[in-house]
């Protein structure tokens, strides 16, 4: 969440940076400043009136002690009049404060100076590519055909149990999921990340703290009876471990990893985008999260990008890294790198990870702070990334490694899967 002081002291710069994200309501910045002015005015009026009441009450006490009842009574009338204005002032202050908070949470995070201009995914900048695109033999098929051929996922039964977009993994398909999750977690923990198994539902405060609410209200599954939300990513519960927390500077950086199922409504998707495992409502993902000092957060971002890149190299998958343009960035992000893997049978790039620096946007919302060397309270910076999201990784592993008598698996998965081939 942006701070009013930032908007007030850097108004034009804030508007320019919001324009990079193509934010449609730049006038909201002026509205927020005006609401803050009104809040301060009302607070000053309330404090002045309350001070008069307090001072007069003391004076009444003195007069009564001196036997000056008549003088005390005359002041009581003034006190009564002042007190009658306090309650309406409180109510007006509460309304203005609510209007201020409702307005400020609509503002997205400000983009870093490194964010390229642009509106659509076509404007994202390819930073680098790696791996070798496979040359498939004639007759190679997309993963949705391979899934049927090798009986790995049952979409029809999943749809019967729940609905479309809820796949039922079975046999070697389920085993491959488990192997990937275990490998990803081992890879992350060996790099110093502490593993967590978080709750897969969160309350409203947690969803607000990481920026899912109110921005993604309609994209999340909401259990209204208890006002809980199914998580769209492990980022939400794991980052909230440090909500309302003051950490010691020597504990930073805090490195966390977690596996979770993820639930997303994904309304509006159609066509090739939703074939097979390309886009589903429930999927598995392993996440990495770091909390660190502000001056180190962009070095940490580079470290996390390299971490995910090396993981993809071990899977022997062709990939590319993109720096997202302003129009394609997430609401909470200051800078995001996307990883895409080449799907040889579909002849297209599929996103498998996003790695983002949120700077202090999330930590202001969740009140995650630390004391610096001078004993001054500072807001930490938070970062997260997918390491990795499974469905499209599975799709590309199946497609890119298909041979006449099965599907070859990368060497790093052999001991986890128990075999070199499906």
Label for each model-derived stretch:
Residues 1-134, 152, 156:
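N-terminal alpha-helical targeting/anchoring segments
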Residues 26, 129-422:
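TRNA-recognition modules of translation machinery and tRNA-sensing kinases, especially anticodon-binding
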């Amino acid at each position: 969440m942006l701070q009013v002081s930032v908007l007030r002291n850097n108004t034009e710069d804030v508007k320019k940076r919001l324009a990079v994200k193509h934010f449609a309501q730049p006038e909201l910045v002026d509205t927020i400043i005006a609401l803050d002015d009104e809040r301060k005015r009302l607070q000053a009026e309330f404090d002045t009136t309350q001070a008069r009441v307090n001072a007069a009450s003391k004076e009444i006490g003195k007069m009564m002690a001196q036997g000056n009842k008549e003088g005390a009574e005359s002041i009581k009338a003034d006190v009564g009049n002042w007190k009658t204005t306090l309650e309406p002032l409180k109510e007006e202050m509460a309304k203005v404060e609510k209007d201020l908070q409702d307005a400020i949470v609509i503002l997205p995070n400000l983009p870093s100076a490194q964010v390229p201009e642009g509106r659509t995914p076509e404007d994202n900048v390819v930073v680098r590519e790696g791996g070798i695109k496979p040359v498939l033999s004639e007759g190679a098929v997309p993963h949705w055909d391979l899934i049927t051929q090798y009986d790995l996922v049952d979409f029809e039964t999943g749809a019967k149990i729940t609905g479309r977009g809820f796949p039922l993994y079975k046999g070697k398909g389920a085993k491959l999921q488990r192997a990937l999750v275990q490998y990803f977690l081992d890879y992350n923990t060996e790099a110093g990340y502490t593993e967590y198994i978080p709750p897969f539902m969160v309350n409203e405060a947690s969803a607000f703290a990481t920026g899912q609410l109110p921005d993604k209200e309609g994209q999340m599954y909401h259990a209204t009876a208890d006002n809980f939300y199914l998580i769209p990513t492990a980022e939400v519960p794991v980052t909230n471990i440090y909500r309302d927390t003051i950490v010691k500077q020597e504990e930073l950086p805090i490195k966390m990893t977690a596996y979770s199922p993820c639930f997303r409504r994904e309304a509006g998707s159609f066509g090739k985008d939703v074939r097979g495992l390309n886009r589903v409502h429930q999927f598995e993902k392993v996440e990495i999260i770091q909390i660190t000092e502000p001056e180190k957060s962009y070095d940490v971002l580079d470290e996390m990008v390299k971490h995910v890149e090396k993981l993809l190299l071990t899977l022997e998958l062709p990939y590319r890294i993109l720096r997202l343009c302003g129009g394609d960035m997430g609401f909470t992000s200051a800078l995001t790198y996307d990883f895409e893997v080449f799907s040889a049978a579909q002849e297209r790039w599929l996103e498998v990870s996003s790695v983002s620096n949120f700077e202090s946007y999330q930590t202001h919302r969740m009140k995650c702070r630390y004391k610096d060397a001078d004993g001054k309270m500072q807001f930490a910076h938070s970062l997260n990334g997918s390491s990795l999201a499974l469905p499209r990784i599975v799709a590309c592993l199946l497609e890119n490694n298909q041979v006449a008598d099965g599907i070859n698996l990368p060497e790093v998965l052999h001991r986890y899967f128990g075999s070199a081939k499906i």
